[in-house]
Amino acid sequence: MFNQSYLNVYFICGTSDVPSHRTIHEVLEAALKAGITLFQFREKGESALKGNDKLVLAKELQHLCHQYDVPFIVNDDVSLAKEINADGIHVGQDDAKVKEIAQYFTDKIIGLSISDLDEYAKSDLTHVDYIGVGPIYPTPSKHDAHIPVGPEMIATFKEMNPQLPIVAIGGINTNNVAPIVEAGANGISVISAISKSENIEKTVNRFKDFFNN
């Protein structure tokens, strides 16, 4: 069952997102201990794990999340999400159609990326629990990212559909969260702000402060 508070501090990570001196397990556990509210396993890039290696890692990270009662979401990979019985899946505009995914994930969390008004207009949100809007700011984590849309896009979507849960993504750090919250976002999703933080506990707690009012 989806709760929009899951979106508050939403951590996204894969093996290519962590510094060389740390493992993804260490980074995720530190983030979980600090209080992230949702985790998305996003294994992308030239060095991304595939096949059984990816499956094994996904199961290990899922187990970690469940020890802390944090939902485990898979990015894009429908077959992996089904195989490990993930808590949900997040897809982009070019990935599998949401309607088809909903057949397999009737009681799971489904998230959809939307970058602009055109994508919003052509998206079927019937089975979608939340949308990921961005990139809000320029981001180094996604080489194929769209032009930054700014917090204003969140405000626009909230005006169009006040009940739709929205998580912001793209270039977010502890210094630029305030305009996102003011625009009406239910949470922020970050990659490098947490994965490359020198003090993950401090970073996560600063993010949490924006949503604990």
From Swiss-Prot:
<dbReference type="GO" id="GO:0009229">
    <property type="term" value="P:thiamine diphosphate biosynthetic process"/>
</dbReference>
<dbReference type="InterPro" id="IPR022998">
    <property type="entry name" value="ThiamineP_synth_TenI"/>
</dbReference>
<comment type="pathway">
    <text>Cofactor biosynthesis; thiamine diphosphate biosynthesis; thiamine phosphate from 4-amino-2-methyl-5-diphosphomethylpyrimidine and 4-methyl-5-(2-phosphoethyl)-thiazole: step 1/1.</text>
</comment>
<keyword id="KW-0460">Magnesium</keyword>
<dbReference type="GO" id="GO:0000287">
    <property type="term" value="F:magnesium ion binding"/>
</dbReference>
<dbReference type="InterPro" id="IPR013785">
    <property type="entry name" value="Aldolase_TIM"/>
</dbReference>
<dbReference type="GO" id="GO:0004789">
    <property type="term" value="F:thiamine-phosphate diphosphorylase activity"/>
</dbReference>
<feature type="binding site">
    <location>
        <position position="113"/>
    </location>
    <ligand>
        <name>4-amino-2-methyl-5-(diphosphooxymethyl)pyrimidine</name>
    </ligand>
</feature>
<feature type="binding site">
    <location>
        <position position="171"/>
    </location>
    <ligand>
        <name>2-[(2R,5Z)-2-carboxy-4-methylthiazol-5(2H)-ylidene]ethyl phosphate</name>
    </ligand>
</feature>
<comment type="similarity">
    <text>Belongs to the thiamine-phosphate synthase family.</text>
</comment>
<feature type="binding site">
    <location>
        <begin position="139"/>
        <end position="141"/>
    </location>
    <ligand>
        <name>2-[(2R,5Z)-2-carboxy-4-methylthiazol-5(2H)-ylidene]ethyl phosphate</name>
    </ligand>
</feature>
<dbReference type="GO" id="GO:0005737">
    <property type="term" value="C:cytoplasm"/>
</dbReference>
<dbReference type="InterPro" id="IPR034291">
    <property type="entry name" value="TMP_synthase"/>
</dbReference>
<dbReference type="Pfam" id="PF02581">
    <property type="entry name" value="TMP-TENI"/>
</dbReference>
<keyword id="KW-0479">Metal-binding</keyword>
<feature type="binding site">
    <location>
        <begin position="40"/>
        <end position="44"/>
    </location>
    <ligand>
        <name>4-amino-2-methyl-5-(diphosphooxymethyl)pyrimidine</name>
    </ligand>
</feature>
<dbReference type="GO" id="GO:0009228">
    <property type="term" value="P:thiamine biosynthetic process"/>
</dbReference>
<keyword id="KW-0784">Thiamine biosynthesis</keyword>
<feature type="binding site">
    <location>
        <position position="95"/>
    </location>
    <ligand>
        <name>Mg(2+)</name>
    </ligand>
</feature>
<feature type="binding site">
    <location>
        <begin position="191"/>
        <end position="192"/>
    </location>
    <ligand>
        <name>2-[(2R,5Z)-2-carboxy-4-methylthiazol-5(2H)-ylidene]ethyl phosphate</name>
    </ligand>
</feature>
<feature type="binding site">
    <location>
        <position position="142"/>
    </location>
    <ligand>
        <name>4-amino-2-methyl-5-(diphosphooxymethyl)pyrimidine</name>
    </ligand>
</feature>
<feature type="binding site">
    <location>
        <position position="75"/>
    </location>
    <ligand>
        <name>4-amino-2-methyl-5-(diphosphooxymethyl)pyrimidine</name>
    </ligand>
</feature>
<comment type="function">
    <text>Condenses 4-methyl-5-(beta-hydroxyethyl)thiazole monophosphate (THZ-P) and 2-methyl-4-amino-5-hydroxymethyl pyrimidine pyrophosphate (HMP-PP) to form thiamine monophosphate (TMP).</text>
</comment>
<feature type="binding site">
    <location>
        <position position="76"/>
    </location>
    <ligand>
        <name>Mg(2+)</name>
    </ligand>
</feature>
<keyword id="KW-0808">Transferase</keyword>
<protein>
    <recommendedName>
        <fullName>Thiamine-phosphate synthase</fullName>
        <ecNumber>2.5.1.3</ecNumber>
    </recommendedName>
</protein>
<dbReference type="InterPro" id="IPR036206">
    <property type="entry name" value="ThiamineP_synth_sf"/>
</dbReference>
